A protein has these predicted regions:
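Surface-exposed, low-hydrophobicity beta-strand/loop segments enriched in small/polar/acidic residues
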Residues: 2-157
């Protein structure tokens, strides 16, 4: 199947700016199109150092969701965690460590590591890294999927 690449961000809607108070006529209804990227590297029970996931989030983007999709159960796991960060030295500053049990199949929704961590990733692209603290797991494999609004450029409320 053919694919098309846009430089983005992609927006949808018919009214770009609010000039009045009539919905459907002159009140802004344009919104961001949600983008998604999936890791091309598996996080396994043996991924004990920060590992690049092959996911690059464009500057000024708002992260909406980060999911862990288990592709092979984390055998014997009771306390295995997966965390996501934006550098090898800070592999836990984007997605807080999330427990992955021996029966978890997911998708498992991660939480942001700190208040506002997903609002706006900053003025430069970031590469995501994952790390696993296996503890008792003797097997297991997961993929990370990230949904984001490209160049949403949010400011604090």
């Amino acid at each position: 199947m053919a694919s098309t690449t846009f430089s983005g961000p992609i927006k949808a809607g018919t009214i770009s700016n609010t000039t009045g108070t009539t919905l459907g006529d002159n009140v802004k209804n344009v919104g961001q199109v949600v983008m998604t990227q999936s890791s091309n590297v598996a996080l396994t029970h043996a991924t004990t150092t920060a590992t690049a996931l092959g996911i690059i989030i464009p500057a000024n983007s708002q992260i909406i969701n980060i999911n862990i999709v288990v592709e092979s159960l984390f055998t014997n796991s009771s306390t295995t965690t997966i965390a996501i960060g934006n550098a090898t030295g800070t592999p836990t500053n984007i997605g807080a460590a999330h427990n992955v049990s021996a029966t978890a199949v997911g998708p498992l929704k991660m939480l942001q590591a700190s208040v506002g961590a997903w609002d706006n990733i900053g003025t430069s692209d970031i590469e995501l890294f994952g790390i696993v603290v296996a503890n008792s797991a003797s097997a297991g494999k997961a993929r990370i999927v990230v949904d984001y609004a490209q160049n949403n450029n949010l400011t604090a409320l």
